[in-house]
Amino acid sequence: MQREEKQLEASLDALLNQVADLKNSLGSFIYKLENEYDRLTWPSVLDSFALLSGQLNTLNKVLKHEKTPLFRNQVIIPLVLSPDRDEDLMRQTEGRVPVFSHEVVPDHLRTKPDPEVEEQEKQLTTDAARIGADAAQKQIQSLNKMCSNLLEKISKEERESESGGLRPNKQTFNPGDTNALVAAVAFGKGLSNWRPSGSSGPGQPGQPGAGTILAGASGLPQVQMPGAPNQQQPMLSGVQMAQAGQPGKMPSGIKTNIKSASMHPYQR
């Protein structure tokens, strides 16, 4: 009897240590989520989850160990129930349970889930029993197929991202040409003042331009219409005006006013 009691105490101590470690890990993780959420990174969250998962697995191993007695065979009976505040209970429960009364005992010493939870569990069990074996197998195969396709897509994206990160990006432009183009557009660097023949302005020697054309056209006769002495209209070349005194022609009343090239209005 004493051997079983010692074994039970040792198992309880080991179980309490594992639960304390799990509680500390949960407390630190909750503190990070509430106070350090702005600096929290996804790798640190994964590390916290991995730590909690490892501690839960260790706790399950302790419970399933062959030297651990079956705690379900042990009976816990409350000896004293009081509505008054218990300081020792407050200290042991870290302020979560101030009193050990009739309202608290059913919640903390219950060995079965709540009646609502039991009802939901029964409903789920009944619904699962209604499904036939063939239909359940088809649903399982469909779910496995969807999961396999999803895992394949995720692994493909990971491989492509890793290969894209290792392979250097191919350059599709020449930086020298880009800089030269920007300098030419912004500052005119590398641009010359060359103009094609015939496009230069008047006054440039050696290049025929608009001034030469206008100078050649200055010799055209200008006809002054009667009644409009200040308006001069240039006549096209090749048009011959009838002169007075020519035989067979009527004397024209139009007077021609021929000016020299220096007096042409466009030659300034």
UniProtKB/Swiss-Prot annotation:
Biased composition (Gly residues): 200-209
Region span, Disordered: 156-176, 193-268
Pfam families registered for this protein in UniProt: Med8 (PF10232)
Residues covered by region (Interaction with the Elongin BC complex): 142-151
Keywords: Activator, Coiled coil, Nucleus, Phosphoprotein, Transcription, Transcription regulation, Ubl conjugation pathway
Modification type Phosphoserine: residues: 82
Record carries keyword Mitochondrion: no
GO biological process, one term: positive regulation of transcription initiation by RNA polymerase II
The keyword Secreted appears for this protein: no
Cystine pairs: none
One annotated GO molecular function: transcription coregulator activity
Pathway: Protein modification; protein ubiquitination
Subcellular location: Nucleus
Assigned GO CC terms: core mediator complex; mediator complex; nucleoplasm; nucleus
Protein family per UniProt: Belongs to the Mediator complex subunit 8 family.
Subunit structure as annotated in this protein's UniProt entry: Component of the Mediator complex, which is composed of MED1, MED4, MED6, MED7, MED8, MED9, MED10, MED11, MED12, MED13, MED13L, MED14, MED15, MED16, MED17, MED18, MED19, MED20, MED21, MED22, MED23, MED24, MED25, MED26, MED27, MED29, MED30, MED31, CCNC, CDK8 and CDC2L6/CDK11. The MED12, MED13, CCNC and CDK8 subunits form a distinct module termed the CDK8 module. Mediator containing the CDK8 module is less active than Mediator lacking this module in supporting transcriptional activation.
Cited function: Component of the Mediator complex, a coactivator involved in the regulated transcription of nearly all RNA polymerase II-dependent genes. Mediator functions as a bridge to convey information from gene-specific regulatory proteins to the basal RNA polymerase II transcription machinery. Mediator is recruited to promoters by direct interactions with regulatory proteins and serves as a scaffold for the assembly of a functional preinitiation complex with RNA polymerase II and the general transcription factors.
Protein name from the UniProt record: Mediator of RNA polymerase II transcription subunit 8
Annotated source species: Mus musculus (Mouse)
